[in-house]
Regions:
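Catalytic histidine-centered segment of alpha/beta-hydrolase-like enzymes
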Residues: 156-166
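Acidic catalytic loop of the alpha/beta-hydrolase fold
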Residues: 128-133, 159-160
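Serine-hydrolase catalytic machinery in alpha/beta-hydrolase-like enzymes
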Residues: 1-68, 79, 153, 163
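C-terminal alpha-helix
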Residues: 170-178
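Short alpha-helix in the alpha/beta-hydrolase fold that links the catalytic acid
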Residues: 14, 108-111, 120, 134-142
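Primarily recognizes the serine-hydrolase "nucleophile elbow" in alpha/beta-hydrolase
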Residues: 51-117
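Active-site nucleophile loop of the alpha/beta-hydrolase fold
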Residues: 31-32, 95-104, 127, 156
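Short beta-strand/loop motif that positions the catalytic acidic residue
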Residues: 118-119, 124-126, 130
């Protein structure tokens, strides 16, 4: 699980999801900028490479096939995971929590150019009032994803309050549907 740009691997939602999927192996990781103590997120090529490296480490440590991994994260982290998969990283599915469809107030700057390469199951979990993408905007954009997409809407914005248990349960149920 990859964190959003303003958070680290200890973000409450990421740890709730990682804890809930046990006994499956789950790893929350930090991007290189966070490890270096910087505040500004890495550029996409660096962040996508970090996703690839973390996926390779989990495959080696857990002795599983890369195509069985489910990758994901929150906001920036989820976007970087989806871009890594679009660029060819094998995965069984994507969990995208509070996906940043566009910057707040700039719906013309969509972050969806890679959606057409996501030929795998994708779970989106977002707040109905998220300034990074409304339910209507998501419905319009996810049709570009060739794989099956599931949208789950929660009350709230980009970081839905008191929703960790609901988000974790949603992810667990969705993972069970992949078997």
């Amino acid at each position: 699980m990859a964190p959003g740009a303003g958070a680290d691997r200890t973000h409450h939602t990421l740890t709730a999801v990682a804890d809930s999927v046990a006994p499956l192996p789950a790893v929350c990781f930090d991007f290189p900028y966070r490890k270096a103590g910087k505040r500004a997120p890495d550029k996409a090529p660096v962040a996508v490479a970090a996703v690839r490296d973390e996926a390779a480490a989990l495959v080696a440590d857990a002795h599983i096939a890369a195509r069985r991994l489910v990758l994901g994260g929150r906001s920036f982290g989820g976007r970087m995971c989806s871009m890594a998969v679009a660029e060819g990283l094998p995965a069984a599915g994507l969990v995208l929590l509070s996906y940043p469809l566009h910057p707040p107030g700039k719906p013309e700057r969509l972050r969806t150019e890679h959606f057409g390469a996501l030929d795998l199951p994708v779970l989106f979990v977002s707040g109905r009032k998220d300034p990074f993408g409304s339910p209507a905007e998501f419905e319009w954009e996810v049709v570009a994803i060739p794989g099956p997409s599931t949208m789950v809407w929660l009350d709230g914005g980009h970081d839905p309050r008191n929703a960790d248990e609901t988000i974790a349960r949603t992810v667990v149920d969705w993972l069970a549907s992949l078997r």
